[in-house]
Amino acid sequence: MSEPLILGIESSCDETGVGIVRGNDLLANEVASSMEQHVRFGGVVPEVASRAHLEAIVPVLDKAASTAGVDLSELDGIAVTAGPGLAGALVVGLSAAKALASWLNKPLYGVNHLAGHVAVDLLEHGELPMPCGALLVSGGHTSLLWVNDIATDIIEVGSTIDDAAGEAYDKVARVLGLPYPGGPVIDKAAAEGDPTAIRFPRGLTARHDMVKHRFDYSFSGLKTAVSRWVETQQRDGVEFRIADVAASFQEAVADVLTAKAVDMCQEYGLTHFLIGGGVAANSRLRTLLAERMADAGVELRRPRPGLCTDNGAMIAALGVQVVKAGLPASAMDISADSGLPIETVLV
């Protein structure tokens, strides 16, 4: 039996992505980002994102089909992000997928955006031994997952109880007078700084947190600590290096993310682990996680940075797994679900 040929559409936030995948082979991955339109607002504006998706979806779709060199009539199915994400943005991608599936008379698969971040690793490293652990870290989500089967059985073991890691990056960047989005600019600034210059707090790592929040994250306190530290220095007229603050903040984030990931692997006897999501492109996080997983005897899978951010290829990759699992197609009247839980891989 030939490998499924799946087209994936992603529109959960500010990237309009279309990917085409045959099995674990990536044929096309085209992305149009509306990031520049959100910079002056200091964050993603849902209405602006939705309008950008409307303008970009057809050109991106055409480019992906051309790059892949396949006739859309050859597709075995259309996969699309059904959630979680911005409601209006999701509707644009879902509507496009429904129209395409109807026109081509192909099955529609509404899938979970977060599970897509797990599935995308298959495109780079091939089949993933199960069970495995996963850390998904982005602007909207920070979760530790137990993955028994990418298409049917993903369990959230821990998550953030307040801000996601990516949100903290954006807010700290604003405090430091750095532009949006905060992740890349703080990563760049931190490269010139001293990560030991300031000891910022690591949320939910105290002994009393281990009972209820052993595998959960909290970045609100860290964000506040950085803000207050900067305010104090400015009030007292003390000069400081932005690079040192950025590096110290980034070290705190990477430290707690990786420590809990390793703890999860040791607690559940996991020997394979992967990382995904936009913040997974962060250089310090990738390096520290690799070091700590190696010390723990756990094989780490890290997709290249370009596959960590939102894209259509990850949705197509997940669609392939759904088809190979023999799961039924989604109904054509499915709705977008901005709060779709990770446990629901297929809608």
From Swiss-Prot:
- What PROSITE patterns has UniProt attached to this entry? GLYCOPROTEASE
Co-factor(s):
Fe(2+)
- Compartments (UniProt record): Cytoplasm
In which broad location class does this protein mainly occur, judging by the first location in its UniProt entry? cytoplasm
Q: What residues does substrate bind to?
A: L136, V137, S138, G139, G140, D170, G183, D187, N282
What function does this protein fulfil?
Required for the formation of a threonylcarbamoyl group on adenosine at position 37 (t(6)A37) in tRNAs that read codons beginning with adenine. Is involved in the transfer of the threonylcarbamoyl moiety of threonylcarbamoyl-AMP (TC-AMP) to the N6 group of A37, together with TsaE and TsaB. TsaD likely plays a direct catalytic role in this reaction.
Q: Which HAMAP family match?
A: TsaD (MF_01445)
Q: What does the similarity note say?
A: Belongs to the KAE1 / TsaD family.
Name of the protein this chain belongs to: tRNA N6-adenosine threonylcarbamoyltransferase
Q: Which organism is it from?
A: Cutibacterium acnes (strain DSM 16379 / KPA171202)
Please spell out the taxonomic lineage of the organism that makes this protein.
Bacteria, Bacillati, Actinomycetota, Actinomycetes, Propionibacteriales
Gene this protein is translated from = tsaD
